[in-house]
Each structure stands twice: as structure tokens, then as C-alpha cells.
Amino acid sequence: DLMAANPDYVRQLELLPEDKRRAHRYGDWDALAGAYFSEFDPGIHVCPPFSLPPDWSRYRAFDYGLDMLACLWVAVNPAGKCYVYREHFQKDLVVSQAARRMLDCTAPGERVVCTMAPPDLWSRVKESGKTMAALFAEAGLGLLRTGNNRQAGWMAVKELLRPDSSGEPGLRIFGTCPRLISDLQSLRHDPRNPNDAAREPHGITHGPDALRYFAQTYLLPPGDEPVGELEAYRRALWA
């Protein structure tokens, strides 16, 4: 019996959100109904933190509003495997403060290729006549505009979560990013659109949205829309 042989496994199960705990601990698989990322498995997709090799590319991706700044740092190894190695969540920050927090949370000497942000930051602010992207740039943080097709973005996240032929997923998350891990497990399907994730409760959407911006930009060219299934689109894209 796995649980008798490995008490740590039982303790790990008790730390899961209620629906995951009921399913994996007690066999109540109906509890997972509605989970958007039902394929997300902490045993596969969460790993202990480790020292990142200096030749790995690093990126930032964030979701921003006064209600919450959610920033993720992602490293990509030469084989294309992605690791979310840092997270920062903080509310009530104006643009200049948000830019400073993201820069301050980035380790000294850490070279970040680009910072990915959603296209709504390129809308003009009435008070200044400038875009929020311009305000971020003035605060020292230039941004890369991502696509915002929600379905394509979620499909890209699911593609990264999918294990390859050797059983290795395209995305892992350091255990030191508990907020993202929890929010991914808590996200539900939109009851009106099964291909989309629910926008409520809003508090759990910020981290997954930031991951969506990264995944869509990493797998798909910004601004383009996928045609057919994501895998077919990728094959055509990289042919």
C-alpha cells in the first residue's frame, strides 16, 4: 500500500486543495469536475528549487492592475523545457511601483531576455495620454506585447504541461512558487464556455493569466491566431 509505505505522500496529499485531496486521498474523482487544469499534477509539475545554469534563457511575464501585480520569472533550458522559478504577488501598486518591484525582485546580474505583458497595457490612460506600457518603460521596464486570445493562451499552457514521449512535461514550477501552484489547481472552467477558464473568483486568475501570456508568446507568434488544434498550428509554424 503506497500510503502505508510512504507517509510523506499522505502528508503531501493533505496539502492539496480540497478537490485534489478528495480525489487523490479518498478516490472521489468527481471532485475534480470543473477543474480547468485537470492535467496539473504536483508530483509531475512541481519540483524543488535548484541553481539555474547561466546559459538558460530567462523571461518575466506579468498581469497587472491595482488589485494585483502577479509576476512570474521563467527559465528555459537548451532543450526548450520551461521552469517557473520565482513569483511575486502584490496589490495596490501604481505603475512606477510595480516596475520597481519587478526589477528589485530580479537578482543582481540576472539577465532577463524580455518582460511579457498583455495588450491592454498599450491602451492610453486618459489622465496622461500615455499608455501604461510607456509608463512602465519610463520607470525602467520595457515590455513585449503578448497576444490575448484566451483560448489560444490556455491551450499553450496545456501544451507545456503535457508530458513528452519520455514522460517529461514542458513546464515545471519550483515549489517556492506556492501561489501559482495553488491558483492553477483552483482554476475552474467557464460554465458558459468550456474552452475558457472562469474569470471568477478573480483573485486566483492573476498568476494563471501571467503564465498564459508567457506560454502563448513562447509557443505562438504574438498577435497571430491559431488555426485548428494547437499542435497542428505549431507544426506548421516551425516547419
Language-model segments: which ranges?
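A residue-level signal for conserved active-site and pocket-lining positions in enzyme catalytic cores
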Residues: 25, 71, 115, 184, ...
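Short, hydrophobic alpha-helical segments
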Residues: 214-222
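Anionic group-transfer/hydrolysis microenvironments
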Residues: 63-65, 120, 211
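Short beta-strand scaffold segments in enzyme catalytic cores
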Residues: 69-75
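Histidine-centered active-site/metal-ligand motif
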Residues: 206
